[in-house]
């Protein structure tokens, strides 16, 4: 292959030797967990939270949120049942779908109606902010309060704020240029839609393609700056994120650029089982996980693999402060 391409192929990534043996993800996970425990005991840390955290409290995933908005739109042509077809129309892209919904509503709704539609689709009348995962995240902050610096969330909701408050942890939502108070900060880098519809804290979220591009291209956007600060100055723990967001990956690359040190951040990800119907499923799944692991190492991340989002993941978060 090297003779054919005229190049020398890499033998390792960040010191990880590529082996012909099957990747033992369980042993690798256990070693990574030990690294994580030591790291957050010795260093300040930040928590990066994604949709998986809010979904554990029965809030909708991104696609269900968009479907709920379609269903509540007053234009009357498309309904929630049309989501699969509309997804194809929008090239299977959630942010393109977000733009489609905005355009669909633009002539029929004002900004207030759009926000209200989003609020109803997000909460659907359910005042829920509790789950085993959220409880363990709160306990992690409680037990490591001196090291815990902030939450950076990509979620619109205030699930974490209400959960922290119920645990006696004073906190403050930051969703723009509002200045932090002397409380535990929760940064909403994609916008903020609290359960209690208060006029003075409404923040239109990053929902559609053009809004996403506006954040992406502006390196000095407050949300990009806060994420870079956390990535550069603290150990970061990623929970409930798919890690496919292009802007997040770009910021990780920037923060990790030219670094010769071992990966300093940690991401919890579900085990890969894409090849479950294949005869060589275990081998292929393990190999895919090995390659993914090395890809994330290039971004400065160590992977902690888990099997169950609702049972195993909370146990691993608990182990961080146990």
PLM region spans:
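A short secondary-structure junction signal
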Residues: 161-166, 197-204, 247-253
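Active-site glycine-centered loops adjacent to acidic/histidine catalytic or metal-binding residues
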Residues: 50, 155
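Active-site-proximal helix-loop elements at catalytic-domain edges
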Residues: 1-26, 116-123, 190-213
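Conserved RecA-like ASCE P-loop NTPase motor core of nucleic-acid helicases/translocases
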Residues: 151-153
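Short acidic/polar capping segments at secondary-structure boundaries
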Residues: 156-159, 165-166, 191-195, 241-244
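Short, active-site-adjacent cap segments at secondary-structure transitions
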Residues: 54-55, 158-160
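Glycine-rich phosphate-binding "P-loop"
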Residues: 105-133, 204-219
């Amino acid at each position: 292959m090297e003779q054919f391409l005229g190049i020398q192929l890499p033998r390792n990534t960040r010191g990880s030797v590529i082996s012909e043996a099957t990747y033992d993800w369980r042993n690798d996970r256990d070693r990574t967990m030990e690294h994580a425990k030591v790291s957050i005991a010795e260093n300040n840390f930040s928590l990066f939270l994604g949709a998986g955290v809010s979904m554990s409290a029965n809030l909708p995933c991104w696609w269900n949120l968009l479907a709920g908005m379609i269903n509540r739109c007053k234009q009357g042509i498309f309904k929630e049942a049309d989501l699969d077809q509309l997804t194809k129309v929008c090239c299977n892209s959630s942010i393109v779908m977000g733009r489609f919904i905005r355009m669909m509503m633009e002539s029929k709704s004002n900004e207030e109606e759009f926000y209200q539609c989003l609020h109803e689709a997000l909460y659907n009348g359910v005042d829920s902010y509790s789950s085993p995962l959220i409880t363990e995240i709160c306990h992690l902050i409680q037990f490591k309060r001196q090291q815990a610096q902030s939450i950076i969330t990509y979620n619109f909701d205030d699930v974490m704020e209400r959960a922290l408050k119920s645990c006696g942890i004073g906190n403050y939502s930051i969703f723009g240029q509002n200045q932090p108070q002397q409380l535990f900060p929760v940064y909403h880098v994609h916008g903020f839609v609290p359960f209690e519809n208060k006029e003075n804290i409404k923040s239109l979220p990053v929902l559609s393609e053009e809004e996403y591009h506006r954040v992406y291209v502006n390196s000095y956007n407050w949300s990009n700056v806060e994420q870079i600060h956390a990535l550069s100055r603290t150990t970061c723990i990623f929970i409930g994120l798919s890690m496919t967001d292009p802007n997040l990956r770009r910021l990780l690359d920037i923060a990790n650029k030219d670094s010769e040190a071992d990966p300093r951040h940690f991401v919890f990800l579900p085990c890969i089982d894409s090849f479950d119907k294949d005869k060589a499923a275990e081998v292929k799944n393990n190999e895919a996980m090995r390659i993914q692991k090395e890809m994330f190492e290039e971004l400065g991340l160590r992977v902690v693999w888990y099997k169950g989002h609702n049972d195993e993941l909370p146990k691993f978060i608990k182990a961080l402060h146990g």
